[in-house]
């Protein structure tokens, strides 16, 4: 079982915690991580692209000239696809790009992402994270005590408004709950900061 040092909010070591081998100790599966990231990014796409077909563009109801006798090519509408200003054939239409991987694959991807942070030594476990009032200064002090200088993902067991508001104005810092742990957020941030309660909750869900 991987062992990780537990810190308090000031950055002092207060003990150790054994992380679940089946979650944090597995060998990361890069192929599954790739698939999970692609799935999440696909679901973030707006998909609002749209062009007009010949039935939607304005005009073109009348035949521009008679069928025979002009010497020109026959035309039925000035909004046919070959005309300037005509409709588009097989153009993009609004659609959802979202799709889902099998549940087992999604769970393996989250485990692999968490295990990656352990392998890289980029996981920090906090005994607890309590802020009496939403103050950015207090959150910066916590991060400074933990010597976190890059992008950090903070995972709490439950929603904590003071923590969320305190981190909101700090570039590169994101706060989520244990229920919302996902592959894209874990891999996108350099450091993963979890409270002990959040670790227990994640292990309970993914066990």
Curated annotation (Swiss-Prot):
Disulfide bond residue pairs: none
Any one cellular-component term (Gene Ontology): ribosome
Chain segments annotated as coiled-coil in the UniProt record: none
Function: One of the primary rRNA binding proteins, this protein initially binds near the 5'-end of the 23S rRNA. It is important during the early stages of 50S assembly. It makes multiple contacts with different domains of the 23S rRNA in the assembled 50S subunit and ribosome.
UniProt similarity note: Belongs to the universal ribosomal protein uL4 family.
Subunit structure: Part of the 50S ribosomal subunit.
Protein name: Large ribosomal subunit protein uL4
Gene: rplD
